[in-house]
Amino acid sequence: MIFDKEDFESFDPELWAAIHAEEIRQQQNIELIASENIVSKAVMAAQGSVLTNKYAEGYPGKRYYGGTEAVDVVENLAIDRAKELFGAKFANVQPHSGSQANAAAYMALIQPGDTVLGMDLNAGGHLTHGASVNFSGKTYHFVPYGVNPQTELLDYEEILKIAKEVQPKLIVAGASAYSRLIDFAKFRQIADSVGAKLMVDMAHIAGLVATGAHPNPLPYADVVTTTTHKTLRGPRGGMILTNDEVLAKKINSAIFPGTQGGPLEHVIAAKAVAFKEALDPEFATYIEQVIKNTQAMADEFAKVDGLRLIAGGSDNHLLNLKVLDLGINGKEAQDLLDSVHITLNKEAIPDETLSPFKTSGVRIGAAAITSRGFKEAEARKVAQLVSKALVNHDNQEKLEEVRKSALELTHQFPL
């Protein structure tokens, strides 16, 4: 029977080869994609457990299927740990992704066609913050806000001005490519001044919030959404937090039956593991090192003529670089670095002139390399290698030197 096929490699060699190739890539490459990380074996074990066999529509104690006693325990553990981790009164751990979490939060907070303020994509916002190609921009009337063109920092006075002009029902704070601290108290003041709700998407900074390395949005936001991977170092998934009991009920309904059916209890189990790991004091040490590594890289990039640090540097786990002045666009930089065992992604910048498929910049994060064991010395070396490749993008001899150095570095810190 097929269920007896325990030898994955011999049963499905094509798929096994692809997975093995990805394992080799992760071993050999310096991972700088800011939304990626390296999870623990415990997280992977939970996600690969027998819980994947179980359907459990509904919520603990109120399921539409029988035999859910064990998964109720699993989900309640995840909920309780999430609440403890972020100081929330209510947590929904069922969203399959951050986008699913945002979709449900919108359903709970506003109606189709309502006006919403969200961060512009070029300024560092996310697709689900109102991009015209996304469900958010198609379903709701999003008005974008950006950053100050000189400082490239959030301009709270300008955001207030826009809010007063358009009178939004909801303001969305949070970003996917913003390297500085976000003042949630100011966002709360702006929202209150126009009678709007405040939603914070902390997907990128959740790990920092959990340890106090970034201000917690929970005291200010009506609803907080997040992913459970990225800096939180858990499985790919989403979560919604609130301190409002009425909104909590609306959120639960928006997830099930509103936007999802059965929850992925094996993923929820992995979330529970990650939350327990994040509650350990060692996780705070990890996040502290992430920030140190990011700032070490920023210091090195600041020395390179032709590279420009967006917003002048970083307060969190990521930084953005304009590379166009080196005669290479973001997509070309991404492909070039991938060829020398360094992985990052192209990124639009606030004064973007190119298409989203090219971009003028790249985004760099330190979460994964820190999980691998890199400290400031290695982070500086990484920045030097990235810079060397970008500056010498048409010099094959120099690129080969970078490739060898990158392999030597990853060999010193095996996964």
Curated annotation (Swiss-Prot):
Its cofactor is pyridoxal 5'-phosphate. It catalyses: (6R)-5,10-methylene-5,6,7,8-tetrahydrofolate + glycine + H2O = (6S)-5,6,7,8-tetrahydrofolate + L-serine. Transmembrane segments: none annotated. Belongs to the SHMT family. PANTHER family: SERINE HYDROXYMETHYLTRANSFERASE, SERINE HYDROXYMETHYLTRANSFERASE 1. Homodimer. This is Serine hydroxymethyltransferase. It comes from Lactococcus lactis subsp. cremoris (strain MG1363).
